[in-house]
UniProtKB/Swiss-Prot annotation:
It comes from Edwardsiella ictaluri (strain 93-146). InterPro entries: Arginosuc_syn_C (IPR048268), Arginosuc_syn_N (IPR048267), Arginosuc_synth (IPR001518), Arginosuc_synth_CS (IPR018223), Arginosuc_synth_type_1_subfam (IPR023434), AS_cat/multimer_dom_body (IPR024074), Rossmann-like_a/b/a_fold (IPR014729). It catalyses: L-citrulline + L-aspartate + ATP = 2-(N(omega)-L-arginino)succinate + AMP + diphosphate + H(+). GO terms for cellular component: cytoplasm. The gene is argG. GO terms for biological process: argininosuccinate metabolic process; L-arginine biosynthetic process; urea cycle. ATP binds at residues 12-20, 40, 122. Signal peptide: none annotated. It is found in: Cytoplasm. This is Argininosuccinate synthase.
Length: 405
């Protein structure tokens, strides 16, 4: 059990069962230390924040700070990753992965402001989040102690946590009936557990929270025009908005048409495979818009580099290395490529799909005169022969050498 001397500790608090139990547990096991509850508002469900300060105080916290990070989350964390085209293992838009460094950074800043000597999170010992939180803590405030209750206590079940709170007369609205584990922010919502623990069991409707089932979506497609400047979405249907505002507008459209659902088995950083259902409606539309502009403005080599860049960025962000030099280096490359990614894209939303059907950009490299197959073709076909001979020279040499043997 605890051996460190801690007088004041800042807890990343969600108001859920786990972190509600952590508050009294910290006071009992760390010398009746002062526990400060920190709540990051990153666009999670509004009902999760109602009365959260009172809930923290009833659990024994000395105070509770709720910090609005919604715009910061989208502008400074989501948009930079979106520029790179990062998709973890080809499909996951990194909703939880991008949020954790921001939460941990704001938590560290509050701890330093209040003169705390320790930080605490409620991530389990099997998941990725413990790594993401603590890697950020180490990068920004290595002098602060870190407490991870799930790696210390013997409360291993939901029932044990409920009994723990009941024994201390701490009220909670949690029950034993919870089946799924969910994480939500402005960008996405994830669902794990329950029926999803068997990869052979299809996800049922309870696994989806935000989005309409594609087969039940409207029978008529809906078109949305997305404005992009330097790799960032700046307007929806001609209306300029903040990053968070753009996401809210696209989320509303995407959920109605069942856009942004994925059901995947992913490789966790800690070596365990896990299955989850992710819903990222607005983000999926944004990704389609950016890729549409990229098709016009990036040459072949730049596009291939962006593909490699996105893959590497996905691993760095997923692993929680947001403040590492590698992530910053990758970001510089992504920003350079995105400098030309400006334009407008019309996205068709229909039965779970978001398809770019019209696109334009002042930086477009697409030239109709060169692309046409008509008689007014400005491309001299005879030039292709010399290019092909040089392009295939290594193959020719290899074949000639083989013939001599």
């Amino acid at each position: 059990m605890a051996t460190q001397s801690i007088s004041k500790i800042v807890l990343a608090y969600s108001g859920g069962l786990d972190t509600s139990a952590i508050i009294p547990w910290l006071k009992e096991n760390y010398g009746d230390c002062e526990v400060i509850a920190f709540v990051a508002d990153i666009g999670q469900e509004r009902e999760d924040l109602v009365g959260i300060e009172q809930k923290a105080l009833r659990s024994g916290a000395a105070s509770c700070y709720v910090v609005d990070l919604r715009e910061t989350f989208i502008k400074d964390y989501v948009y930079p990753v979106l520029k790179s085209g990062a998709l973890y293992e080809g499909s996951y838009l990194l909703g939880t992965s991008m949020a954790r460094p921001l939460i941990a950074k704001a938590q560290v800043e509050l701890a330093l402001e209040l003169g705390a000597d320790a930080l605490c999170h409620g991530a389990t010992g099997k998941g990725n989040d413990q790594v993401r939180f603590e890697t950020t803590y180490t990068a920004l405030a290595p002098q602060l102690q870190v407490v991870a209750p799930w790696r210390e206590w013997d409360l291993r079940s939901r029932e044990a946590l409920l009994d723990y709170l009941k024994g201390r007369d701490i009220p909670t609205t949690a029950t034993l009936e919870k089946i799924y584990s969910r994480d939500a922010n402005a960008w996405h919502i994830s669902t794990e557990g329950g029926v999803l623990e068997s990869p052979w069991s299809p996800a049922n409707q309870d696994c989806w929270v935000w989005t309409c089932a594609p087969e039940e979506a409207p029978d008529q497609p809906e078109l949305v025009t997305v404005g992009v400047e330097k790799g960032e979405v700046v307007s929806v249907n001609g209306v300029a908005m903040t990053p968070f505002g753009c996401l809210q507008a696209l989320n509303a459209l995407g959920t109605r048409h069942g856009v942004g659902r994925i059901d995947i088995v992913e490789n966790r950083l800690v070596g365990i495979k896990s299955r989850g259902c992710y819903e990222t409606p607005g983000g999926t539309i944004m990704m389609a818009a950016l890729r549409g502009v990229e098709q016009l403005v990036l040459d072949r080599d730049s596009f291939q580099w962006r593909e490699k860049l996105g893959q590497e960025m996905s691993y760095v962000v997923y692993d929680g290395r947001w403040f590492a030099p590698l992530r910053q280096s990758l970001q510089a490359a992504a920003d350079a490529l995105a400098d030309a990614v400006s334009g407008e894209v019309v996205i068709k939303l229909y039965k779970g799909q978001a398809i770019a059907i019209q696109k334009k950009s002042v930086n477009s490299l697409y030239n109709e005169a060169f692309a046409t197959f008509g008689e007014d073709d400005v491309y001299d076909h005879s030039h292709a022969g010399g290019f092909i001979r040089l392009f295939s020279l290594s193959s020719r040499i290899r074949a000639l050498n083989s013939a001599k043997q």
